[in-house]
Regions:
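Flexible coil/loop and intrinsically disordered linker positions at secondary-structure junctions
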Residues: 1-139
């Protein structure tokens, strides 16, 4: 359910369930695939950078119901997948997401060009896997 709560320092946070963020008749299949991507990544790397890749894939693939911000997505992932130890902090992953989707160079300079290239590649690969669920003729 869409819920707005007063956050720290007076910021309003929007809380949305992951299932409500996803567009299509394949919500359960997409959620399952997102969990697979997350589980596979977390076997080898505890970093939350996978969340930036998944969110970029969803946004670039047109698989969300609205134009959500990264923080809303991060909160939805923490709520949906509590067993994966997704950190409460989101600053680095949010900066990485913004760098991945940026068309110009207006991103956080603490993110290296190599991290951005790797992030864009992962996001594209994940996007194709997610789109193949919605439309098997995609790839």
């Amino acid at each position: 359910a869409l819920l707005e709560v007063q956050g720290r320092r007076g910021r309003k946070s929007t809380i949305v369930l992951l299932e409500e963020m996803l567009k299509s008749d394949c919500v359960s299949e997409l959620t399952e695939k997102i969990q697979e991507e997350l589980a596979e990544w977390k076997q080898y790397d505890e970093a939350d950078s996978i969340l930036a890749y998944i969110f970029a894939a969803l946004m670039k693939g047109g698989l969300t119901t609205d134009d959500y911000n990264y923080r809303t997505f991060h909160a939805a992932m923490r709520e949906k997948f509590p067993d994966y130890n997704i950190s409460k902090g989101f600053d680095w992953a949010e900066a990485l997401y913004n760098a991945i989707i940026s068309e110009d160079f207006s991103y956080n300079t603490s993110i290296s060009e190599e991290q951005i290239k790797r992030g864009r590649k992962h996001a594209t690969d994940i996007k194709l896997r997610l789109l193949s669920i919605v439309n098997p003729n995609t790839v």
